[in-house]
A protein has these predicted regions:
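Short, solvent-exposed mixed-charge patches
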Residues: 302-303
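Non-transmembrane, membrane-proximal soluble domains of secreted or membrane proteins
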Residues: 1-193, 199-220, 233-272, 276-278, ...
Length: 303
């Protein structure tokens, strides 16, 4: 009531616009946005245009599984799991595929995330300029163990990478010399059922049967284990794999066993994979401690 209009009240000053102010608040933000646009375009092109020490890009097929990563080196004909080894200063062209649900491929210190979609090939292009180990992970919720779908990018000097590559291109020994490892190989190929999901080139796979993906996706269900002994993390980079903590000893009964089972991540995985990573595809085989020790001795020999 107090501020109601009264008869003969004076009219307030009327403002009908200020061309100068309107031009300023239009031009200044436009210039700012243009600067941001130019910087964004420059950065986007810079992300995929590298000055590489190696003129030939390294082409790798990256396959997202539940819940681990497969890395297939297309020109080198080798495959690894959970560890992507690359040379420093080389353009990497990663072809991204999924065998099940949507994943997302991301290494925060090297590149932004890119979705990995079933039935749709995607691409991530990057380059690592410093030697070191970089942690990667899935950033798209993909099921129960999404948080445990990790991997490492291991960047080596060109010479170290060439040495690693030469070793990876070799098939596994068909007959281990160590008797415990030999017993583990027989177990792998026999009653344990391991070979039903895993393959080892030179043992139960030919050189052209190493893929989990592509034209013959039925060859393997689990990770390729040809050079398992050279890796340092397993089960989607959830467990450490260190031979020093998985020492195989012979007991008074003449049977092998693991010296310290609690410290051995691979022992825990083989004993009860569902306790380590519930919902994963690896079934419990009810292996005895002796059988686990034999399998560990064999897997360790696969360097």
């Amino acid at each position: 009531m107090r501020f109601r209009e009264r008869p003969n009240s004076p009219a307030p000053v009327q403002t009908h616009g200020n061309n100068t102010v309107e031009l300023i608040w239009t031009i200044v933000p436009s210039v700012f946005l243009f600067i941001v646009l130019v910087g964004t375009i420059y950065t986007m092109f810079g992300l995929t245009n590298f000055t590489s020490a190696n003129s030939r890009p390294l082409q790798i097929r990256v396959v997202g599984h539940q819940w681990w990563w497969e890395f297939d080196y297309l020109n080198e004909h080798i495959v690894t799991a959970d560890e992507l080894v690359i040379p420093v200063g080389t353009r990497i062209e990663a072809q991204l595929l999924s065998q099940n649900v949507i994943h997302s491929f991301w290494v925060p210190e090297l590149f932004g995330k890119t979705d990995v979609v079933p039935g749709h090939d995607n691409m991530s292009i990057f380059q690592a300029d410093n030697v070191g180990t970089y942690r990667g992970q899935c950033t798209e919720f993909c099921g129960l163990q999404h948080a445990h779908m990790n991997f490492n990018v291991i960047v080596k000097s060109q010479d170290d990478y060439n040495t690693w590559l030469s070793a990876q291109e070799q098939s596994a020994s068909s007959t281990p010399t160590d008797p415990t490892a030999l017993a583990g190989q027989k177990l792998f190929l026999g009653s344990s059922g391991c070979q039903g999901c895993h393959g080892i080139v030179g043992v139960n796979l030919k050189d052209d049967q190493h893929l989990n993906s592509g034209a013959d996706a039925s060859v393997l269900v689990g990770p390729n284990l040809t050079h398992f002994g050279s890796r340092r993390e397993i089960a989607g980079a959830v467990l450490q794999w260190d031979p020093a903590t998985c020492v195989v000893v012979t007991g008074s009964n003449g049977q092998p066993s693991i010296q310290d089972p609690e410290a051995c991540g691979l022992y825990q995985w083989l004993k009860d994979p569902q306790a380590v990573k519930p919902g994963n595809d690896m079934v419990i085989r009810s292996l005895s401690d002796t059988e686990i020790a034999q399998l560990i001795a064999y897997l360790e020999s696969l360097k």
